[in-house]
């Protein structure tokens, strides 16, 4: 099985280059200001100018953005736009995101409390869904493990959609994660870092080596 990998939280060109050379199919850039891996659009532009990557393989990441911020991401030219939001976030705003971005480019990442199921009402709004770890006060990048059992069920039940497994993935658990969830696409961030926003190249190498 071929596994697609997105390395997220890129803030430096040297890390972007190494991730691509190691086998990453996507790079993620976090525009959320409260993230320790926050990066500005002009900084992403400077990094991407000399990268061997098509814009379609660059992913912009935000949390509950307003339409103006979302439009800036679209205008930048990201191939995909990954949006995190609370479980009870208004569906009418999600529909507006879908209309503005388009379901093909939109990756929806609901923050799902473990006792709740997947909200079926959002399925028509995007073609891709990312399952990250749940914490009450943060959106992604926590190093915590996500709901693997839920991911496995939802990927099988809603198999016309693309599902991305995120949350606490590392060289130490990527083999178990893929074998347990049957994930075809994974997102790694803090598990291959020295510090927030600074990647550990040895861990990146080990991560790709350990993919089953």
Residue locations for each model-derived region?
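Conserved N-terminal beta1-alpha1 strand-loop-helix module at the mouth
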Residues: 1-185, 190-212
């Amino acid at each position: 099985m071929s596994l697609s990998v997105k390395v997220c939280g890129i803030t430096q060109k040297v890390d972007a280059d190494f991730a691509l050379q190691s086998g990453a199919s996507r790079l993620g850039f976090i525009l959320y200001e409260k993230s320790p891996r926050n990066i500005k659009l002009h900084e992403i532009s400077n990094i991407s100018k000399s990268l061997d990557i098509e814009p379609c393989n660059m992913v912009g990441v935000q949390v509950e953005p307003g339409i103006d911020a979302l439009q800036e991401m679209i205008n930048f030219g990201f191939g995909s736009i990954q949006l995190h939001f609370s479980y009870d976030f208004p569906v009418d705003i999600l529909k507006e995101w879908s209309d503005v971005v388009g379901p093909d480019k939109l990756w929806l990442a609901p923050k799902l409390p473990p006792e709740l199921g997947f909200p079926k009402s959002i399925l028509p709004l995007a073609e891709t869904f990312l399952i990250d770890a749940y914490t009450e006060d943060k959106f992604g990048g926590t190093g915590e493990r996500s709901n693997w059992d839920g991911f496995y069920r939802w990927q099988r039940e809603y198999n016309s959609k693309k599902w991305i497994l995120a949350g606490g993935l590392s060289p130490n658990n990527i083999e178990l994660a893929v074998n347990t969830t049957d994930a075809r696409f994974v997102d790694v961030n803090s598990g291959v870092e020295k510090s927030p926003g600074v990647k550990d190249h040895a861990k990146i190498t080990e991560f790709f080596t350990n993919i089953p």
